[in-house]
Regions:
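Catalytic beta-strand/loop cores that center a nucleophilic Ser/Cys/Thr
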Residues: 113-160
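Two-component/phosphorelay signaling modules centered on CheY-like receiver
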Residues: 16-25
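Short hydrophobic/Thr-rich beta-strand motif most characteristic of the beta2 strand and flanking loop
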Residues: 25-31
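Extreme N-terminal starter segment of soluble prokaryotic enzymes
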Residues: 1-3
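Acyltransferase
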Residues: 173-193
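Cysteine-nucleophile active-site neighborhood
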Residues: 44-113, 117, 182-184
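Proline-aspartate-enriched helix->loop->beta-strand connector
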Residues: 43-44, 170
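Short amphipathic alpha-helix with an adjacent loop that forms part of the alpha/beta core around
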Residues: 35-43, 137
Length: 193
């Protein structure tokens, strides 16, 4: 089962649909409807932290999931979930130099990252965000996997754990190859039946 932590965002059900085309076992729970222990007791094969409004610290159990389940359950954070990943592991989340809502930008990929297997070096990615993880604040255990031409971080991976973050939205129609990214994540962590 894939567990999606819903951070009260309309994109959550786009994620649900994208995952549901790959595996029938998907469950969505609100970020304040259960504890991390209760989430772990569901025995998910992977957890996806959804986009959402506000700051990562205000997103229910989202940051606690990263802190308490690292190394136990593979995790993919999208937008707010990505920012939570950056913050939990020592990065700084700050106001983006340019607010971007509903724009598809070119995103350069590190194709050694399992999420970007069989993708071209640059893809279009949908951006809807006011905050970013500041590159200068990254600890050594967080590796940049995707960025804009201006150098804004669009993807992260943890050096030691199966934890990945995407600032852009793979579930959006404005990310034409987004379904491949989601499938690559689920396949890489062994979560496809």
């Amino acid at each position: 089962m894939i567990l999606i932590i819903d951070n009260y965002d309309s994109f959550t059900y786009n994620l649900y649909q994208a995952v549901g085309t790959l595996t029938p076992s998907v469950q969505v729970v609100r970020n304040d409807s259960l504890t991390v222990s209760e989430a772990a007791a569901l025995q998910p094969q992977a957890i996806i932290l959804s986009p959402g409004p506000g700051k990562p610290k205000e997103a229910g159990i989202t940051e606690a999931v990263l802190e308490e389940l690292k190394g136990q359950v593979p995790i993919l954070g999208v937008c707010l979930g990505h920012q939570a990943m950056g913050e939990v592991f020592g990065g700084t989340v700050t106001l983006a130099p340019h607010l971007v809502h509903g724009k598809a930008d070119d995103i350069s990929l590190d194709r050694s990252c399992p999420l970007f297997k069989n993708l071209p070096p640059v893809i279009k990615g949908a951006r809807y965000h006011s905050l970013i993880v500041e590159k200068e604040s990254l600890p050594p255990e967080l590796l940049v996997t995707a960025e804009t031409h201006a150098g804004e971080i669009m993807g992260l991976r943890h050096r030691d754990y199966e934890i990945y973050g995407l600032q852009f939205h793979p579930e959006s129609i404005m990310t034409p190859l987004g379904a491949v990214i989601i499938e690559n994540f689920l396949s890489h962590v062994g979560a496809l039946s």
